[in-house]
Amino acid sequence: MNDLKPILFPGMEPRRPLVIAGPCSAETEEQVLRTARELAAEGVRIYRAGLWKPRTLPGGFEGVGAEGLAWLRRVKRETGMYTATEVATHEHVTAALAGGVDLLWIGARTAANPFA
């Protein structure tokens, strides 16, 4: 564990803990922007929001999908925060990167069963 490197983006100080915060699920543009503004006012620099939601059982809300990418771009533009979202497929990765998302992660459910 001696080879750990800090996770930094331009303009961020190397401090601990690194706080990444935001809603588990992006549901509306208003919710995303309101939450981002409140978190930015508290000094959070990385905003996370789930756009694609893996579910154990089919038929539940699976997220707003690519529609939410415009919301994250607006978060970045209006607050200066970096943005992050969970991805599960090659299509998600391609869309998120094309949409300007700064940080991607693969969740536990996805690692076990990628939106099967």
Where are each of the predicted segments found?
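N-terminal amphipathic alpha-helix/helix-capping segment at the start of soluble metabolic enzymes
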Residues: 1-20
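Active-site-adjacent beta->alpha loops and helix N-cap segments on the catalytic face
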Residues: 3-6, 29-31, 56-72, 89-94, ...
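Solvent-exposed alpha-helices and their adjacent loops that cap or buttress functional pockets
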Residues: 10-14, 74-77, 95-98
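Hydrophobic faces of well-ordered beta-strands that scaffold small-molecule active sites
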Residues: 18-23, 45-49, 83-85, 104-106
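Glycine-enriched alpha-helix->loop->beta-strand junction motifs that scaffold or abut catalytic
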Residues: 43, 95-105
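Long, contiguous binding/interaction regions
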Residues: 2-3, 21, 27, 36, ...
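Glycine-rich phosphate-binding "P-loop"
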Residues: 51-62, 77-83, 104
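Nucleotide/phosphate-binding sheet-loop regions of phosphoryl- and nucleotidyl-transfer enzymes
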Residues: 11-17, 28-34, 52-57
